[in-house]
């Protein structure tokens, strides 16, 4: 990348999975320190949650800080192991908080407390398992059409990620009907359920 700039963009919630970051944790001492620092700030063992099979990882109050920690640890590993020096950081949704830490705008401990509270509030708003999200992808997707198709369902457009992707969110029981309607009206669309306990 001669004369170019290096940008790192962090994803949002829904990117979590059991075992995330374990390889970096085991191979990079700096990553272990980040997980330890996060555990001290949050009062629970972040590494154990990320590397084990605990379903709490899919609860937004735990998923959000765990994702931020893993993203910062991965950044540390990339910098340490490959000597990459990012010029710019960005993020999508929850990833914006990680970008603030990476850019040195806010300390990790502060962001972890913020996203834990953010996730807890989301979790309190809707009982576990009653909310769902799906990404809908289609060239030049029309948000108004989506809203009209789903108007009588407890589902709405939650995010407009790009001209070609939106996220719908609402009651999980209504999600299959929403997907059926979208498939019938917009045959060329793709949709993917997102791994988020709350929407």
Question: Which residue stretches match the model-derived regions?
Answer:
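Helix-rich "cap/lid" substructures immediately adjacent to catalytic or cofactor-binding pockets
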Residues: 2-90, 168
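Alpha/beta catalytic cores of group-transfer enzymes, especially the acyltransferase/condensing modules
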Residues: 13-15, 103-193
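Short, electropositive, low-hydrophobicity segments enriched in small/polar residues
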Residues: 16-18, 23, 47, 95, ...
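Hydrophobic alpha-helix position signal
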Residues: 39, 78-79, 100, 150, ...
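Generic structural signal for short, solvent-exposed loop/turn connectors between secondary structure elements
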Residues: 49-58, 83, 95, 139-142, ...
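Gly/Ser-rich oxyanion-binding loop with an adjacent helix/lid
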Residues: 65-135
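Positively charged, low-complexity/disordered segments
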Residues: 194-199
